[in-house]
């Protein structure tokens, strides 16, 4: 994928940035695509950098993701909780699976969805081959992760754990309005009022 370059005029002349670095200057982190260890490490590094720059200023995490590896997503989530800077989450396009979990884990009152975004929650997926004992061990770990994710999402949404358990048994799709009623987001936005943009 070709990453666009942005050229800016400064007092010292021209500076060029790749688009993601330019967004980082405005404290915007973009999480696009499937969440794996490489993507997770990039997002974590950006969050830690912005925390070091200004621990009191909001960070805006834009999410357009089908989900991904649970441990990679949990690493991002734990970093969001670890840093002092409030992390606002914004769904653009879709936030599914671990993407929806991260969306719900943003700062209360600062979790958003754009008008036509979709959100989907479900239970963790897993596949493992090997000896019966090892398969059993991995199945137990997936069940432990499922329980933990449901408990955390219940905490963020205000829904009972039992409802999360029932709703995540299968793919559960929501519009922005549905996600707002569910407690995954706080507001639906159609214009940029959160990072100072205007049109």
From Swiss-Prot:
Its EC number is 3.4.21.92. Keywords: Cytoplasm, Hydrolase, Protease, Serine protease. InterPro entries: ClpP, ClpP/crotonase-like_dom_sf, ClpP/TepA, ClpP_Ser_AS. The active site is at 97 (nucleophile), 122. GO terms for cellular component: cytoplasm; endopeptidase Clp complex. GO terms for biological process: protein quality control for misfolded or incompletely synthesized proteins. It holds the Pfam family CLP_protease. The keyword Mitochondrion does not apply. It catalyses: Hydrolysis of proteins to small peptides in the presence of ATP and magnesium. alpha-casein is the usual test substrate. In the absence of ATP, only oligopeptides shorter than five residues are hydrolyzed (such as succinyl-Leu-Tyr-|-NHMec, and Leu-Tyr-Leu-|-Tyr-Trp, in which cleavage of the -Tyr-|-Leu- and -Tyr-|-Trp bonds also occurs). GO terms for molecular function: ATP-dependent peptidase activity; ATPase binding; serine-type endopeptidase activity. It is found in: Cytoplasm. Belongs to the peptidase S14 family. PANTHER family: ATP-DEPENDENT CLP PROTEASE PROTEOLYTIC SUBUNIT. Cleaves peptides in various proteins in a process that requires ATP hydrolysis. Has a chymotrypsin-like activity. Plays a major role in the degradation of misfolded proteins. HAMAP family: ClpP. Fourteen ClpP subunits assemble into 2 heptameric rings which stack back to back to give a disk-like structure with a central cavity, resembling the structure of eukaryotic proteasomes. This is ATP-dependent Clp protease proteolytic subunit. It comes from Geotalea uraniireducens (strain Rf4).
């Amino acid at each position: 994928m070709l990453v666009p370059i942005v050229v800016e005029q400064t007092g010292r002349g021209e500076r060029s940035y790749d688009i993601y670095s330019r967004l980082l200057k405005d404290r915007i982190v973009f999480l696009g695509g499937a969440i794996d260890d490489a993507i997770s490490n990039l997002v974590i590094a950006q969050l830690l950098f912005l925390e070091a720059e200004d621990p009191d200023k909001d960070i805006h995490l834009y999410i357009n993701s089908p989900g991904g590896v649970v441990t990679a997503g949990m690493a991002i989530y734990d970093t969001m909780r670890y840093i002092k800077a409030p992390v606002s989450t914004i769904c653009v396009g879709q936030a599914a699976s671990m993407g929806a979990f991260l969306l719900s884990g943003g700062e209360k009152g600062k979790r958003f969805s754009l008008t036509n975004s979709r959100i989907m929650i479900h239970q963790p997926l897993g596949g493992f081959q090997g000896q019966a004992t090892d398969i059993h061990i991995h199945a137990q770990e997936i069940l432990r992760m499922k329980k933990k994710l449901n408990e955390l999402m219940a905490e963020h949404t205000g829904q009972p754990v039992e409802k999360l358990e029932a709703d995540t048994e299968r793919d559960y799709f929501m519009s922005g309005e549905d996600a707002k009623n569910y407690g995954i987001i706080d507001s639906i936005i159609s214009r940029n009022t959160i990072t100072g943009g205007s049109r």
